[in-house]
Amino acid sequence: ALIDAIYVQERNDNTDEQCKEAKEAWDALTDAQKELVEGENADPDYFGRDTGDASKDDPLNGDEIGENELLVVSFGTSFNDSRAEDIGGVEKALQAAYPDWSVRRAFTAQIIINHVQARDDEKIDNVDQALERAVSNGVKKLIIQPTHLMHGAEYDELKEAVDSYKDKFESVTIAEPLLGEVGSDATVINEDKQAVAEAITAQAVKSANYDSLDAAAEDGTAFVFMGHGTSHTAKVTYSQMQTQMDTLGYKNVFIGTVEGEPEETACENVIEAVKAAGYKKVILRPLMVVAGDHANNDMAGEDEDSWKSQFEASGAFDEIDTQIEGLGRIDAVEQLYVQHTKAAMDGNGVQDDAE
């Protein structure tokens, strides 16, 4: 019940105390009792799963910001190692590129913020908290760099949240998400999508110990990059990424989504596409900034509905491997965020100048 109480998307006056109580109650249990924990959203993994050392992650929630702030906004993840490497990787790259700006962090998922706070006593600002912190610190110029993949629902909600604060600063600019403008249909691609396609493919090939993508193809290996998927109109972005892969000549690279939107990206349809192309080995990798819950469970988990299990159950392939690595730890992707932030600094972004 304590876990269920904090498994919510809204922060309230009781959140901090509820997180503390949940942690104390968990710590008071024996190992045998911990295995029996249950609730609508509670299970032993909520506190007990080893996701890495939280102390290696910097929540970037300090004061003494100065007049120029670069706020990096992410959905978030409760997987400690992924948070430090993927989200932290982007944040560190931005701080290195812009030493005269103070980099701070905000997550949009309060459920994740509460999870991390209750389990690890690490406090991460939500967007409102981060904006209030900026105001109280006298920030004048605020640039917000979302780590979101696209102009989807999360990006729209961020713009709405920031809009109510625009009069608190001399200027507020929201930079582009990773894949840039959406475009009108599945055939529309851009430099951002090309850069990400090249970066994730090169890293996947390297992690699989192949000399090249062609060498992987000759070995009968296909790469499947699994995104989240969305019912938002921005879902065409995933189709565009497949178009981008095809345009680059990456014939053994396929795009899928957990949600199966767009339809051709659903797991069963991707399985059929890979099978029809004749590949016998498959490497699954997340097309996500963070290798969090979706990568570890929906993609690489042992449950029968995970992508790994579905590919194995198809009986069409000899070998299924997974790479649990987010986009945020890839140097070329980090530098793309640096470029988007630079464009925002130069006035190319969603601009909200105070009246």
Q: Where in the sequence are the language-model features?
A:
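Extended amphipathic ligand-handling, pore-lining, and cofactor/metal-binding catalytic surfaces
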Residues: 45-283, 288-355
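Beta-rich interaction/scaffold domains
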Residues: 1-50
